Amino acid sequence: MIAKKIKPFAIAPADVGCRNHILGAFRAIGELNGQKLNPDNLFVLPDGSQSFLEVRTALVYTGFKSYREFTEKLFDLLDEYLAHKKQIPQVFITVYNPTESHEPGRNADVLCRAVKEYYKIRNLGKVMTVVLSSRYYKYRYVDLINIPKHLMTFSLRIRLIRNKNLRKKVLITMGTIHNFTMQAVVDKCDDLQAIMKKYEKDADLASIISKLDNFKHKEKKVVFCLGGRVEGSEIVFDINYVQKLYSDAEKLVASGYGVVFVNGPRTPSTVTDYLYEKALKNDNIVFQNCKRIAQIKEDYAPSAWRIYSGPHEEEFRKLQKLGNIYPGVLGFGNTLAVHTMDSYSSCETASAKIPTAVSCRGLYIDPAIRYDCRNLAQLLCPKYAIDFDEFVSMACNMKIEPKDLRPRLLSNPLRVFAETVVKRLNQLG
């Protein structure tokens, strides 16, 4: 099969990181096609959302009582989705997501099994199944398994070498497949500046826009990109850790830096409150909430921790007019992107040639369960990124700036991924 005929699709995930992995895969296939694929047409929406950007509830096998109940839901979604398609997609893509349950491998494999069964029952021909950012797992229904290096251990490498059938399906990459580019940063930076100009006299936004304008004109800058907790207890992302980060931010401010904090869906609401309240008192530190804000009763349940609920809901709703300032704030020049060790986003900025740091100290991560986090930090530092504590010391004592770091560019695996998809699809016939 030639690349131009390939059409991929996916079930839209609720997790932003997973969505970005899938968008990267779509972009890779589109670029090999020589065309820009519209993601609005490639995502199956699992929860009645109007856009893949608005999905709140993921389709997860372990969340159903039985396989039959799961397939009934999936088949209904696929029937509705494919009823409007002129071309039946041949490639189904999903992501190994350890943040949504303790059985991410099983969830991905069963989803791929169900998709293959749907194609067989509906006489749609063969479908190739792909799982991104996976750990080692004995998949039965996945045709292409992307395993980033940081998700492997020595013992898992040995197991993979010994499993010839599984090994044939594996594509190992340095870093993750993602949708982050420097051009996107530039475009988002232009959008951010246009919004700042539009709302500079807005009563709700004037204060934060003034602080962002101050940040923009600083000669050196730092943007903290926060990760957060997961469903289990293996990552402890708490106030103690964030107090340490904020203290480091104050040291950098004292050395002439402008600082921005942006949270994410996994950032605890208590941490969000702490940073917002602290930043209000410092003209050189900006905090912008990027979590969804509670709207309905279900959003206040403990299980809805990815949605912000707390004392600052009204303030954050007013600030929504500004939009998500990340990654636009990375585009002002001489800026360091600081990622917490629990996040894979460090791969994104490192591959876009943005000076990147990884914050490890003070963040507890169970090494037996989430060895991938430490592995990624060790793979990136010091070749492609810098340890954040080292940077703080160098910035404060030696006047080192982000532009002085000059890290090596982390290669983006998009093309090799797309070429592998074409090759495997041809092998499947």
Model-derived features: where do they sit?
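Structural motif
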Residues: 7, 89-93, 128, 144, ...
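Active-site and donor-binding regions of nucleotide-sugar-utilizing enzymes
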Residues: 9-172, 178-180, 300
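A nucleotide-sugar donor-handling region in carbohydrate enzymes
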Residues: 140-238
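Short acidic-hydrophobic, aromatic-tinged amphipathic segments that line or gate anion-handling sites
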Residues: 171-174, 285-295, 306-314, 321, ...
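Leloir-type glycosyltransferase catalytic cores
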Residues: 194-204, 374-429
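Conserved catalytic-core segment of nucleotide-activated headgroup transferases in glycan assembly
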Residues: 222-225, 229-270
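Catalytic donor nucleotide-activated moiety binding site of glycosyltransferases and closely related
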Residues: 254-318
